């Protein structure tokens, strides 16, 4: 019996040992082993990458929220520019209005000069309004020819004068051309000094004298052509008949005998 009990106790101890030995590998694998630790470390890195993606999304949202603020600031700048232009335009209009109501120089002007001065100031006001509208809406028209010129030197004004002359003289056949020039010259000379006006007047006087000489010479030539030597109408008729003498010489001879 003692032997059987000892054998049974031995079997029980061996079973416990086997059970303990089986649990050890499981504990080693499930514990802090190298392979298990590496796998979890990789998963931790994946979680870090996910956090970075969230950061990118947050940055994009922040940028999207910042952009409207920039647009608002730009609109404010544009509005301020427009207000400044309006203030300048209002100031110009007040100055022009003041000049229209009260002339700066206390001088006596003829009704024509007063009208020309008012028209000139009105034109300046219209040009100022147009310029303000262009600047407000960002209009930039490309112009050529006379409108594109901005003369400053003598050569520039010479070229400008040629283009202007070609532009105006193309209407010289019009019935209203002379009266148009009269008004134009007076309007463009209204702001000149007396000495400059005298120079222009002298130049026009010389031109008028030359035109008169040419007209007299032309009339003298016409009178010479109208004089018929040797008998007036009789000689003229004789010459006309002589033109037919080549075909039949009897016409001229019969005419002389008859006379």
UniProtKB/Swiss-Prot annotation:
One of its GO terms (cellular component) is cytosol. There is a cross-link at residue 107 (Glycyl lysine isopeptide (Lys-Gly) (interchain with G-Cter in SUMO2)). Residues 1-111, 218-247 are annotated as: Disordered. Its main location: cytoplasm. This is Eukaryotic translation initiation factor 3 subunit J. The gene is EIF3J. Component of the eukaryotic translation initiation factor 3 (eIF-3) complex, which is required for several steps in the initiation of protein synthesis. The eIF-3 complex associates with the 40S ribosome and facilitates the recruitment of eIF-1, eIF-1A, eIF-2:GTP:methionyl-tRNAi and eIF-5 to form the 43S pre-initiation complex (43S PIC). The eIF-3 complex stimulates mRNA recruitment to the 43S PIC and scanning of the mRNA for AUG recognition. It is found in: Cytoplasm. Residues 71-136 form a coiled coil. The modification Phosphothreonine is found at residue 110. Belongs to the eIF-3 subunit J family. Keywords: Coiled coil, Cytoplasm, Initiation factor, Isopeptide bond, Phosphoprotein, Protein biosynthesis, Ubl conjugation. Gene3D superfamilies: Eukaryotic translation initiation factor 3 like domains. Phosphorylated. Phosphorylation is enhanced upon serum stimulation. It comes from the Eukaryota. Residues 1-12 have a biased composition (Low complexity). It holds the Pfam family eIF3_subunit.
